[in-house]
Amino acid sequence: MPTPAATEIKPAPLPPVDRVKVRVNGREVEVPKTMPDPLTGKPLPTTMIQACAAAQVDVPHYCYHPKLPVAGNCRMCLVEFGTPAVGPDRKPILNPDGSSKIARSPRPAIACATPVSPGMEIYTETAAVKKMREGVLEFLLINHPLDCPICDQAGECKLQEYSVEYGQSASRFVEPKVHKPKRVDLGPRIVLDDERCILCTRCIRFTRDIVGEDALGIVNRGSYNTLAAYPGKLFANNYTLNTVDICPVGALTSKDFRFQMRVWFLKETKSLCTSCATGCNIVIGSREGKIYRFEPRENDAVNVCWMCDYGRLNYKWIGSQDRLRKVQSPKSEVQSQPEGWSLVIGEVSERLKQAAGGSAAVIGSARQSNEELYLLAKLAKTLGAVTDSVPRMAEGDRLLLNADRNPNSTGARLTGIAAEPIGSNLPKIAEGIRTGRIKTLLVVGEDVTRHGLGPDLLGKLETLIVSDILPSETTRLAHYLLPGCAHAEKRGTFCNAKGRVQKFMKAVEPPGDARPEWEFLRELVSKLSMKDGFATIEGLFNQMAAEVPGFDGLTWAGLGETGVTVNI
């Protein structure tokens, strides 16, 4: 009996979204009547500041943050507004031309907390609004220190920018400033300067509402208000450095980045965090080949605009002096020859050809890119080799840190390099080496001596080919050593735990003779299959998407800056 054709299930249509028309400085813009709450997702009335953003009108603000609950305490976003006038009979009053007459409100409103209504007109550039901004800035600067020459926030400071754009040219305040604590050690990663703090409460709301920890608060009163941690409690959760990102004035500074580099010297590169399977979007700040910081990059589908401290600080190994820099082979003279790579690739390809037919194994790291794992899988298929990857599990949390510390476990499964579950083939590989069935082992990005393949087993191999970034016991035992690159030194893609395929870009050059692994793996695949592969990462990704079902339909260009989710 023939099987009936599957009925296509179409998603239910989304309910219509009510929209309202408002005018911002005379320009009409249509916005949704409600927008989702950044914490709960429940609909909240669209506010003036959101309508202004839709009209591409910048409204200065300090306390407002689009991903935090509204506080409405800085008053910097004050605007004037009007609504359609109505008569005693509650009918609209019309102008002679038939348009609605606008009744201007006698009082300004804070744009961050005032909902829009149909027909509302918002004015952000009137003389009164400019005067209000001057007044707010004057109050904020009364006790603010002139720390700009030594402040880490200089160059990306909203107080600095708004003072130039909206403030007065001179201060009228002649009385002594109120002095507050400076260089307050809040915890293992944060230094607080209370004199710079403008009490916007962004950091308090972040720790309370995003992290779920009441760690910070405002103490004292009036001009003597200060930010402080709770008595006897360190500010030490795994997300503290996000408060440095959202602090608009440099009151909270990172001990890691403090006094290291002026931000206007940094080159910014869009990349991904590789410390776990979440795949947080980041910006790498570098100068002259040195990485100075990781910062979160906004992607609502992955990390919103946050990242954990563990991932943020996990970058110094990239610039380690211990990095592997030279290709090595049993012929020691190769190390000093300029053509070392081509010679070693030739030798390695010959060794692999001899191992074809089941006497080889391939272990690829789930910290490698999708493209590299795809090439490893092709190489293993050509050799008839057993493959696997190394699991890397630790404690996660409810926010961003995933228990899987490999950034590309999903990619390792989709490309076929990893067993299911990951690591289940490692005992088989160890047994194959022990019995002499496996004579050649190719390891990329892992120290397998920590995962059941000790030096005694590796010593039984006829050929051990290793590619890695830092020295290990496995690299020490290698017959052929191929220095690879960190993710910040190459381009490629990862697939996170939820199946989102995302790009990372090259920020700095690799040291010495190190090369992106996909380059020499492509050469090995070409030599063994006698077919030339793509010479660019774009072409390689598109080839992978055409051959691997899990990436079907994707293109490098189509990934954009925030990625595409696939079924896993």
Predicted regions, residues:
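Cysteine-rich modules of extracellular adhesion/ECM and protease-associated proteins
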Residues: 2, 14-18, 55-59
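A short, sequence-level motif marking secondary-structure junctions
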Residues: 32-45, 112-118, 128, 296-301
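Catalytic alpha/large subunits of respiratory electron-transfer oxidoreductases
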Residues: 145, 193, 200, 205, ...
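Eukaryote-biased recognition of intrinsically disordered, low-complexity regulatory segments
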Residues: 15-30
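Short, structural beta-strand-to-alpha-helix junction motif
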Residues: 36-50, 369, 516
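Fe-S ferredoxin-like electron-transfer domains
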Residues: 2-13, 75-274, 278-282, 287-290
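A basic, amphipathic helix-loop patch mediating RNA/tRNA/ribosome contacts
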Residues: 48-82
